[in-house]
């Protein structure tokens, strides 16, 4: 159908002119969450090479204690040359100077198709199905992350598009806010601040205030709320925050005072919270530097 819309078009009716016309259309890009990006593009979005922009030029590394791939400090090479953060050896990966690093080459659609895909020659979508993970190809996970050739490459104009896939903002905002709130409120089992992450911080970063001490205890960090501050935040959202009718759902219903957390927040709730509450709601509850970073 997409091929037909581009090449021959379909008959449509113009009400204002009371006549038929030939309607043609083009698929400019896809919009999805990050896991669905894999299915649509053919590039697997997990593992060391999961970034579809950096591809094999990634700076990701493995966290031995957290047992997962990390992309911390992968983005300083995108800063303008001469930016002071490029030379900062203390606040990012300890001892690392990124002043001479360059971002990966920005590939055109033709380069991706004729150079990257052609060198791997992955199976087509129709041969392996939607996900295409049945058989790993040579070099998969080390040299590339291609698991199939997306059916969208069959569109004659697809290789001429520089931006073919977009990440859904609402999904990203929800994931982002969920992780922030779970860490700020120390939600058991969901906080990113745990013993394993502290051990990895000690290994890779110069942040002695977060290192586990000789007794095996983790110091209380500046980026988490005390019990008093947590209750103050929850009660503020439950009893004091009000929005015009239809602006958002009832955020008060997402407050769980007994367990000290938020639950049941939908994507739009997270969007409203980030846009309207996050810039000021932690001003008196967190350290000023943490609040500025969040807002």
Where are these regions (language model features)?
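A structural signal for the principal folded core domain
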Residues: 1-295
């Amino acid at each position: 159908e997409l091929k037909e819309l581009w090449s021959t078009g379909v008959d449509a009716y113009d009400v204002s002119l009371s006549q038929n016309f030939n309607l043609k259309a083009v698929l400019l890009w896809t919009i999805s969450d990050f896991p669905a990006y894999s299915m649509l593009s053919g590039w697997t979005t997990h593992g060391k090479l999961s970034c579809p922009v950096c591809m094999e030029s990634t700076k990701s590394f493995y966290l031995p204690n957290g047992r997962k791939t990390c992309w911390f400090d992968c983005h300083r090479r995108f800063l303008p040359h001469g930016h002071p953060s490029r030379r900062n050896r203390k606040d990012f990966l300890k001892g690392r100077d990124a002043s001479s690093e360059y971002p990966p080459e920005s590939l055109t659609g033709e380069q991706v198709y004729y150079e990257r895909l052609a060198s791997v020659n992955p199976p087509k979508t129709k041969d392996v199905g939607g996900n295409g993970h049945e058989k790993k190809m040579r070099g998969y996970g080390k040299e590339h992350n291609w698991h199939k050739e997306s059916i969208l490459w069959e569109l004659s104009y697809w290789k001429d598009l520089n931006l073919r896939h977009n990440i859904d903002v609402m999904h990203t905002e929800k994931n982002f806010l969920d992780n922030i709130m779970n860490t700020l409120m120390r939600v058991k089992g969901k906080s990113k601040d745990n013993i394993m992450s502290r051990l990895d911080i000690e290994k890779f970063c110069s942040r002695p205030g977060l290192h586990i001490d000789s007794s095996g205890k983790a110091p209380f960090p500046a980026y988490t709320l005390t019990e008093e501050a947590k209750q103050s935040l929850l009660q503020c959202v439950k009893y004091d925050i009000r929005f015009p009718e239809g602006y958002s759902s009832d955020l008060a219903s997402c407050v769980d005072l007994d367990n000290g957390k938020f639950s049941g927040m939908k994507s739009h709730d997270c969007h409203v919270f980030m846009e309207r509450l996050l810039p000021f709601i932690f001003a008196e509850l967190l350290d000023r530097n943490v609040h500025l970073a969040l807002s």
